[in-house]
């Protein structure tokens, strides 16, 4: 039976207090905080983080597909899934696809992955949902939105979560949308949108699921329920007859915010972190219709506890000191023109060195075992020529050997910290440090690698691996 074999999650390091948002606009923005992607993060980089977490300790050769779900892919015309697959070091002989333009894209991708495995077209399929939505300043969405990602490995062996039943329907109802070329979201009057849209649609889907399988709220250990906001979440929980104190998964509104297509998947990851064998979960996602699933947790859940998931990332955070820092990260203002030549890129170089850039492959000398980056023809230790094998470095941790700080660099967050990292197992890597406190950078600091968007030279996103302090 096809089901969830593994899971992973990601929440950016930075948080923005809703109190700061309210002070910026002299209004009330609610309680709690929302997650904020760093200036070099987007839905693709966060998706890779979730995939890395999901695949922790697993072989990748059996994966036959990757489906990427998002309403904010970095390219309007260019597949994101193929880049995520390369950065995640998946085999080239896989099927990739993007699912987009709907908040329900995450469960849509999951359903197709389940069908793919059931049909025998792939042994395993990796599904990742990630969103990095930007709300209009001083809008109702600005304090509500958050950034994050979740990933699930779908397979038919060592299944940790069985798909015991499902119900879905499509709807053309308009609630939140963006037109072609628009950055910010539109919506209609709240009572109409919620009463005729979310509330009515979810109630219809869950009632149909209960009737189809002969179940009631008492048959479930946990309800994982998508909602547009906390108020409507509480309303529908009551309407469906679930106990809000004992049966309902916390919806992350006060700690992360609404993460778009990744919102329901991230809540499911949080639920699975606490799930025990024998638990039964009702998983409901909404957006242009409804997907509802009955999930059964097996004993295999105990074998995938070593994930950072949601709990670890919730505890690992850094508060933005000002609202203006968020404005800078999101590029919400027109800035003074830079007095320097523009960033440039070379597609031939990016293609020729793709294994070193996206997959972060170094080479290991077959004669002496020395690991080296970037790949070169001659071993720097024993001088053996053209006798090496490529090795993956992206999942290695390391220590800072030396570093420098540039206070005049043209980056959104000064200083620009450059370092040389000694990787565990061998290899030395020259890169930038992100998600950092400059005052805490020191020689010997433990770091890990993360893929980020270095710049947008020549009209394309230039992704590369950076160092960051290990999130603990």
Predicted regions, residues:
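Short aromatic-glycine-enriched beta-strand elements
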Residues: 408-420, 461-465
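Phosphate/pyrophosphate-binding loops at sites that engage ATP/ADP/AMP, CoA/4′-phosphopantetheine
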Residues: 50-64, 203-221, 240
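Conserved hydrophobic positions within beta-strands
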Residues: 398-400, 433
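Short nucleic-acid-contacting surface segments enriched for D/E, G, S/T with interspersed K/R
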Residues: 435-449
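Conserved catalytic cysteine-centered active-site region
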Residues: 24-28, 32-45, 72-125, 235-267
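Condensing-enzyme catalytic core mediating Claisen C-C bond formation in acyl metabolism
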Residues: 1-43, 139-196, 200, 276, ...
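Cys/His-rich short segments
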Residues: 339-397
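OB-fold/S1-family single-stranded nucleic acid-binding modules
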Residues: 450-472
């Amino acid at each position: 039976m096809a089901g969830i074999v593994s899971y992973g999650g990601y929440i950016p390091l930075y948080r923005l207090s809703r109190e700061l948002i309210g002070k910026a606009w002299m209004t009330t923005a609610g309680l709690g905080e929302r997650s904020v992607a760093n200036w070099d993060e987007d839905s693709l980089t966060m998706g890779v983080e979730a995939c890395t977490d999901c695949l922790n300790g697993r072989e990748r050769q059996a994966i036959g597909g990757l489906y990427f779900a998002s309403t904010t892919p970095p390219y309007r015309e260019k597949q994101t899934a193929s880049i995520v697959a390369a950065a995640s070091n998946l085999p080239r002989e896989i099927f990739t696809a993007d699912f987009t333009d709907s908040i329900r894209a995450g469960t849509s991708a999951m359903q197709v992955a389940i069908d793919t495995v059931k049909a025998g077209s792939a042994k395993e399929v990796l599904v990742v949902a990630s969103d990095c939505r930007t709300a209009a300043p001083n809008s109702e969405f600005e304090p509500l939105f958050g950034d994050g990602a979740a990933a699930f490995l779908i397979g038919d062996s060592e299944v940790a979560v069985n798909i015991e039943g499902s119900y879905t329907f499509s709807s053309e109802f308009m609630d939140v949308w963006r037109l072609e070329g628009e950055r910010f979201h539109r919506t209609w009057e709240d009572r109409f949108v919620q009463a005729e849209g979310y509330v009515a649609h979810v109630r219809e889907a869950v009632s149909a699921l209960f009737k189809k399988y002969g179940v009631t709220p008492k048959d479930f250990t946990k309800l994982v329920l998508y909602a547009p906001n906390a108020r409507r979440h509480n309303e529908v929980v009551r309407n469906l007859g679930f106990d809000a104190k004992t049966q309902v998964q916390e919806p992350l509104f006060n700690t992360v915010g609404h993460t778009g297509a990744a919102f329901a998947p991230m809540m499911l990851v949080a639920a699975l972190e606490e799930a025990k064998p024998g638990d039964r979960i009702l998983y409901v996602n909404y957006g242009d219709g409804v997907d509802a699933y009955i999930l059964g947790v097996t004993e295999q859940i105990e074998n995938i506890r070593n994930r950072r998931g949601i709990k670890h990332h919730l505890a690992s955070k850094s508060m933005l000191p000002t609202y203006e820092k968020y404005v800078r990260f999101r590029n919400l203002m027109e800035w003074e023109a830079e007095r320097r030549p523009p960033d440039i890129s070379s597609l031939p170089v990016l293609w020729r060195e793709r294994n070193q850039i996206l997959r972060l492959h170094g080479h290991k000398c077959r004669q002496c075992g020395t690991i080296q980056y970037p790949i070169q023809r001659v071993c720097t230790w024993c001088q053996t020529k053209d006798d090496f094998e490529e090795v993956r470095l992206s999942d290695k941790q390391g220590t800072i050997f030396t570093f420098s700080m540039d206070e005049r660099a043209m980056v959104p967050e000064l200083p620009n910290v450059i370092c040389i990292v000694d990787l565990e197992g061998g290899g030395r890597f020259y890169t930038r440090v992100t998600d950092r406190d400059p005052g805490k950078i020191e020689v010997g600091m433990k770091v890990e690698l993360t893929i980020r968007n270095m710049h947008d030279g020549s009209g394309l996103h230039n992704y590369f691996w950076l160092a960051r302090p290990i999130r603990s």
